[in-house]
């Protein structure tokens, strides 16, 4: 078997594993600590910067498959393997980045700036999910949630320490709170918090 076919086979196995994880409604099998930053530019809301820190067991399994040269580090090519294995299967779930705008969720247009590293035995990934909502003269309100509704991956998102990056031309206010009363989030665990944002032109 050629090395390219071997790599393709390993990637396919990873994709199948992650696809099953997304579709399964079960007790959590993977654990990840999440931090987020809401991003704005002069045009308005532009996306969510994500940092996911996985548990040691999942990290070891992913590294065993993705670390092709077995040096315990993640090269650019190996990061590409991880990006495909982790994010491709959850594309239809909006990469677990749910942003309520009115009565709908915003759709992620693309993923950018993906990075991966191993830190103290844990796989850490960083990426930006691009979503857009233009600024207006009056307040625009959003609710940001990063979570797996199936709870196969238990994502603990620290919304109390979430951050916002915005230009001086915008006025942005935000706070963390529960999701009670928000019908779009009925399928989510009751303890999950959202980042409530409102913004307008100064």
PLM features per residue range, with description:
Residues 47, 60-64, 137-143:
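Short, hydrophobic/aromatic beta-strand segments
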Residues 28-54:
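Early extracytoplasmic/domain-onset interaction patches
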Residues 29-31, 91-92, 109, 190:
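Short solvent-exposed loop/turn micro-motifs enriched in small/polar/acidic residues
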Residues 100-202:
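Mature, soluble, non-transmembrane domains
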Residues 19-23:
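N-terminal signal peptide c-region/cleavage motif recognized by signal peptidases
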